[in-house]
Amino acid sequence: MSTRHTQRTGGRISVRRNEARLAHARARARFDWLLLARGRPSKLYGYASRHRGELIHLPWPPCWCLELHHDPYRDARSATVWGHRWGWPATHVRPRCVQDCALDSCLYVCCGYGEKLQPVGFVKSYVTNSQLDTLRVLLVGKDGAVYVHHMRAARLCRLASSTTEFTRRGLQRDAVTYEEDLELPDQRMCGTNARHLFDVIAAAADEHNLLTVGGLCQTHAGVSCNLLETVGDPWTAVPAARMTLTVPQVQYRLWPEARRDLRRHLYAGHPLGPWLVCGVLSRERETQKPSPPIRTTVGNVPTPGPREVEIAWVVLTLAGPLLAFWPDTGKICRLANSFSTLWKMGPRAMRGHWTYSAPGRHLPGDAWPLCEHVRPQVGKLPRKRAYLD
């Protein structure tokens, strides 16, 4: 009986994997024209001009597409009077550089190397038909990287480093998509009582009631739920992180030095206002140490290398956004704008280092994006940078 059940389950998994491969192959076929950007992104201008108005279904999320347009910024300015006043200047119609997205006159977004970007069209939803859809532009870089530019929010998100990666991820790295798409599934996996408790905490957080959230976390400390994460394709999800309710005193006893680091980031009079440590996010990851060997063989069966548990505190602020604080490294960054967004993003919210902010539009709690242009030397980690205003 169990063997038959295993065979049936294995057959379902293999069918699901085959469907994922076919979906990825179809997505790659739809976006093969993005390969024209290698070396000269301006080649995409002619393709987008010839196929203007054509809708191309995005790999993820469902009901989202790309409307090809050779000059999307001009149409955005004509359709919305105030649209061009948000975000980057109107001269962005020509291929620009990542250097133009500097946070000030001396500091670039990620490094001092520029990257030519070519706009190819609007990113929009089939469900909503709004003029604000013309304020979300897809851009392609010289090295094949794909970006989405939110003109209204003045933010540039690096979706993928190559066309192949974009056909697999889609808009998974864009945090704004999780907030705007109401049909995205909840990534929580827990019991009914735990789910109801987290919903009550989320409702209290939306009302900016830190006292209620703190009381619930103290009464129900230790209650947890798993957060699912997609692996390989956007439709296969596995438990990858755990969200556990806690109280600050317990975490301060475990990490005495982390309390001082957290108060240095969230100082008195911070724009985000009062704050509260309400939970802990934990997930396993492979270590970066070269020894012991990363992969060993036991009985001719390869086993994964050493793994460690990554722990981040969930900090709720009075202004609304959730912050993640790593007590071992002292790093802090914006996790999500609300609990509902965190439930949709899952563990992916812990790796939010792909968004660049325009000058003067850097939000408190935004992490510096990871640089994709300058690779660190082997055995060396990137230099730490400031994380909060």
Swiss-Prot record:
Keywords of the record: Host G2/M cell cycle arrest by virus, Host nucleus, Host-virus interaction, Modulation of host cell cycle by virus
Broad class of the protein's primary localization: host cell
GO biological process entries: symbiont-mediated arrest of host cell cycle during G2/M transition
InterPro entries cross-referenced by the UniProt entry: US22-like
GO cellular component: host cell nucleus
Localization in the cell: Host nucleus
Note: The first DR6 exon is not required for propagation in cell culture. Loss of a part of the DR region may occur in viruses propagated on cell cultures.
Function per UniProt: Inhibits the host G2/M cell-cycle progression in a p53-independent manner.
Family of the protein in this entry: Belongs to the Roseolovirus DR6 family.
Domain characteristics, as noted in the entry: The N-terminus is involved in nuclear targeting.
Name of the featured protein: G2/M cell-cycle inhibitor DR6
